[in-house]
Regions:
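N-terminal accessory targeting/assembly segments
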Residues: 1-102
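Short acidic/polar capping segments at secondary-structure boundaries
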Residues: 98-99, 127, 159
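Short alpha-helix plus adjacent loop in nuclease-associated cores
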Residues: 98-119
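A charged, well-structured terminal subsegment
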Residues: 119, 123-137
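Short, acidic Gly/Pro/Ser/Thr-rich loop/turn segments
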Residues: 10, 129, 202
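Flexible beta-alpha connector loops of hexameric P-loop NTPases
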Residues: 9-15, 45-49, 107-112, 152, ...
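A residue-level signal for conserved active-site and pocket-lining positions in enzyme catalytic cores
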Residues: 23, 122, 160
Length: 243
């Protein structure tokens, strides 16, 4: 179930429908089956329930009728909102950022990319630990037992923080190695040219057409996450590195 909540103002419904179409495309890319779409425009977004308590109850009834397992909010939720909605609905509750990070986790192929995605997921999700025990298990890979005097939640937070610290150390080392490779490329006096564009704009398709790179190119949002670099010979005889 997709949910968009916005303020009443001129053009708000048109914007909501546009964002909802993109959110649905993101959900489909993540492998989620969308069975319902909810748009609510309010005088102000409810600071606790986002939708408003009454509207949330009616949405929950619809979710039960449709056998919904997950609510995906178009806007980012703060930890209190995510926890409150999950507790009242007993559904998995995620927001746009978490959905995009999930897609990144599916698409990342390089070691560097996987580390960056996991670090981003931990940083975003750590403040949200505690809404549900299963959310804690998903984040930390399962919690076996308790530390002395610690609750399951405290153990989960501690282990998540430890993992986050390890990832930051690994990424620091990866950054050093990447800088060394970049210095080697620039020492060859070969210009590096970047292809820049919005997701699904055709960057990978263009790279393949110019260099026969063989990079995955699909009509999906964030189909390719990792950067690929290939040497390209120009008609004048010069070479460039195209990324």
């Amino acid at each position: 179930m997709l949910v968009h909540v916005g303020q009443k103002k001129p053009g708000a419904m048109r914007l909501a429908k546009t964002r909802m179409r993109e959110l649905e495309a993101l959900a489909e890319t993540a492998g989620v089956e969308v069975v319902e779409r909810i748009i609510q425009l309010r005088d102000r977004v409810d600071p606790k329930y986002v939708l408003g308590k009454g509207k949330l109850e009616s949405v929950l009834i619809k979710a039960i009728d449709l056998d919904v397992e997950t609510m995906i909010f178009d806007q980012n939720l703060n930890p209190t909102q995510a926890s409150t909605i999950a507790s009242r609905t007993d559904l998995a509750v995620i927001d746009r950022t978490q959905l995009i990070l999930d897609i990144f986790a599916q698409r990342a192929e390089s070691k560097d990319g996987k580390l960056q995605v996991e670090l981003a997921q931990l940083k975003y999700s750590l403040p949200r630990l505690g809404a549900k025990d299963d959310a804690l298990s998903r984040l930390t890979g399962g919690i076996g037992g308790r530390g002395p005097g610690e609750t399951k939640l405290e153990v989960g937070r501690r282990r998540a923080q430890e993992r986050l610290n390890r990832l930051e150390r690994q990424l620091k080392e990866q950054t050093k190695q990447r800088a060394q490779r970049r210095r080697r490329r620039t020492s060859d006096d070969v210009p590096v040219v970047a292809i820049v564009g919005y997701t699904n704009a055709g960057k990978s398709t263009l790279l393949n057409a110019l260099t026969n790179a063989g990079v995955l190119a699909e009509n999906k949002l964030f189909a390719t996450l990792d950067t690929r670099s290939r040497r390209l010979s120009l008609p004048q005889g010069n070479n460039i590195i195209l990324s």
